[in-house]
Amino acid sequence: MKKLAYLECPTGIAGDMCLGALVDLGVPIDYLNQHLKGLGIDSEYRLWAEKVHRQGQQGTKVHVDLTLDPTHSDHHHHSHHSPHRHLPTIEQLIVNATLPPKAQDWSLKVFRQLALAEGAVHGIAPEKVHFHEVGATDAIVDIVGTCLGLDWLGIDQLYCSAMPTGGGTVKAAHGCLPVPVPAVLKLWELRHVPIYNNGINKELVTPTGAAIATTLSLEFGSSPSMRVQKVGLGAGTADLPIPNLLRLWLGESTETPQKETISVLETQIDDLSPQAIGYVFEALFEVGALDVFTSAIGMKKSRPGILLTVICPPDKVSVCERVIFRETTTLGIRHLTQERSILQREIHWVQTAYGQVKVKVASQGTGENQQIFNVQPEYEDCAELARKHNIPWRIIHQLALAAWNNH
């Protein structure tokens, strides 16, 4: 069983809301303070939590009080009054903090994603980003604290809902910005995040919150198949028409096939040399296609043709379309988005009398609950040994299966 978490963001997401939801789930505030102290910036802030109510519902509000500015009270992501730091400086702070390995890795990834987005907005390299949004003390505490909390809970996979756009404008270090702010839009663009308008005309998603969600979440949209064990509620600062609470569901995966979103590209061709088809296949696989195949079809004027079908991740649609337009004679491509169920796939090695062979094992569940559905030796490994020893491919294939069954 995998431990799953699902970020439900009806009123958006911010770093302090993430911390609040984690503390609400049981992450000790003392644990966070203890490990955050390793960053060497604990003189710049005070971290504490309290129970609050939002539209009648109770949640946990985490405060990051900046001691460098005693008048600071709204903790808004864009109004930092703490030291500005470059990305390399923050990376060094994190590496030197002796954090748990997962928390360190996640923290570095979140900051790099945030710097990538901010750099793209301002037209500079990520490592040269030097302004409030990345360097502020509360952003560091929010991001590293969230990663510490997720690690403390033992989360294996994080998922996230669609995000509300919000509206209006917000004051930032670079002036007055429209909501959603440019960095948030760029982060959404990088992960193709589904968004919607919930009618609330305020900033609902901050760059820090967006960076955490877009970096650490496996998928966006509806919740994964899971048994919900507990829900943590992290309170935002503003009073909104609906409860301003980030809801973090904690649970275990259920024994059902995993779901993933894929894109299907299709085009009909009747005037391309058959010799080119093989090259098109290779080019599509090189840019990230998951599968490519053709079907024989009849076309206009009774001409025989092919239906070229490409299955790829949603973020590979553009590059796959470019290959198809460049390498074929088609004038148009159909694009479908579908969901597919997949089994867990693992690669194991087995030893035969002629050498080692990789074996792909398809299963569902883990440990005592694991159920194996299919075992297949890798074609290329079998072919290489068959050629090397001048024996039939099927013999190597059979020996590999026998080795797996006897392992």
Swiss-Prot record:
<comment type="similarity">
    <text>Belongs to the LarC family.</text>
</comment>
<dbReference type="GO" id="GO:0016829">
    <property type="term" value="F:lyase activity"/>
</dbReference>
<protein>
    <recommendedName>
        <fullName>Putative nickel insertion protein</fullName>
    </recommendedName>
</protein>
<dbReference type="Pfam" id="PF01969">
    <property type="entry name" value="Ni_insertion"/>
</dbReference>
<dbReference type="InterPro" id="IPR002822">
    <property type="entry name" value="Ni_insertion"/>
</dbReference>
<dbReference type="GO" id="GO:0016151">
    <property type="term" value="F:nickel cation binding"/>
</dbReference>
<keyword id="KW-0533">Nickel</keyword>
